[in-house]
Amino acid sequence: MPHPYWEHRDWYDVHDNTSIAGPDREPEHYREFVITLPPIGPGDHVVDVGAGTGKLAGLVADAYPDLGGVTLIEPNEGKLDRARSRLAARLGPERVRPVRATLGEGGSLPAGEATLAIVGSVLMPVLLGRGGTPRDGRAWVVRVLAEIRSLLRPGGWLFDVETVAMPWDVGADDGPGRRLTLLELTAALEAAGWDLVECVYRFRDRVVVRAQRPPSS
């Protein structure tokens, strides 16, 4: 299980990027994420899945201040309140909707509303914290990715920022839990019903993966 310190929103703000991406790579990783995004305007609605304290959504709002709105999905109440405050300061409270929820648990989520879903170093850390085997982990990731797909309008895009396992870290399916490799992550996206899956940025184990909800789905 994750250390309880991660539940403290200020401690999380100080430590999350250093722990996940590393202080040397984090600025480039997140800058490249913003560069890979399509143009975002008043007709777009962004959903930040596992929003934490709103850092990733804040980068999007800074780059595209005219975006139509943001939904923040986060299970931790303190972090969600911090994220809401951050985004409201940039966009105004009327364009920010906080939703306290955990993906992968079959909860009630705002389906079919967003044009763009963003995920910032969420899936792999949660996967490690859940424990279980790699087989269990892949099944959970597919389930979560299917839920994220349901948040989007047909034709909407997902951009997922992750730190993945390297190919030589792969072990037995019934071995200790671990991060997915890039190939396993793209396979999970396809299994969850996504189209046009593509890695649009990679530096060693840092990746940004893009995928589309099929326009006809």
Regions flagged by a language model, labelled:
Residues 155-162:
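Conserved beta-strand signature within the Rossmann-like core of class I S-adenosyl-L-methionine
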Residues 136-154:
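A short glycine-rich, Lys/Arg-flanked "PGG" loop and its adjoining helix->strand segment in the class I
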Residues 107-117:
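A short acidic, Gly/Pro-enriched loop at the edge of an enzyme's catalytic core
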Residues 1-39, 43-52:
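Conserved class I S-adenosyl-L-methionine
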Residues 55-105:
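Class I SAM-dependent methyltransferase SAM/SAH-binding core
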